[in-house]
Structure formats: C-alpha cells, structure tokens
C-alpha cells in the first residue's frame, strides 16, 4: 500500500496509463485480426486495404510504448508477406 502522497499519485497515474494502453493494445489486435480474416477469406484487395489500415496502428503502438518496436516491425513484416503471397499469381 502506498504511504506517501507521491506514491499514491504514482499509483493513480499507473492506473490511468494502464487503461489507455489496454485500449491501444485492443485496437491494434482488432486491426491485425481484420487483416488475418481478410487473408483467410482469400480477398486480396480487402486484405491489402486492411493491412494498410493496420500498419500505422502498429507503428503508433510502438511509438507510444505499448509494443516493442521490433515486435511491431515483425508483425508488419509477417502480415505484409502473407498479403503479398495472397495477391501473387500461383505458378
């Protein structure tokens, strides 16, 4: 239990930041899920649109410290690879 006023304030700040970060993380997951659903449906144009919407969300989460920069980069890279494979002609 926090005893000093500064520790109590820090606890309040942490609670507020946690709520903001939860919302951001949820938003990122939603965008990534939309891309994965579009890929699963096999619609290349829908997948590309969803990917283009998800990319800045992942970058924003990395900038804000919700995701590690390398994690966001890895997710973007893997999604891009899957979207590209979907639109590529099958040989």
Swiss-Prot record:
Record bears the keyword DNA damage: no
Tree of life domain: Bacteria
GO biological process, one term: translation
Pfam families on file: Ribosomal_S20p
Residues covered by region (Disordered): 1-23
InterPro entries, sorted: Ribosomal_bS20, Ribosomal_bS20_sf
GO cellular component: cytosol; small ribosomal subunit
Keywords: Ribonucleoprotein, Ribosomal protein, RNA-binding, rRNA-binding
GO MF term (any one): structural constituent of ribosome
General function of this protein: Binds directly to 16S ribosomal RNA.
NCBIfam families: S20 (TIGR00029)
Family statement drawn from the similarity comment of this UniProt entry: Belongs to the bacterial ribosomal protein bS20 family.
Protein name per its UniProtKB record: Small ribosomal subunit protein bS20
Annotated source species: Rhizobium rhizogenes (strain K84 / ATCC BAA-868)
Gene: rpsT
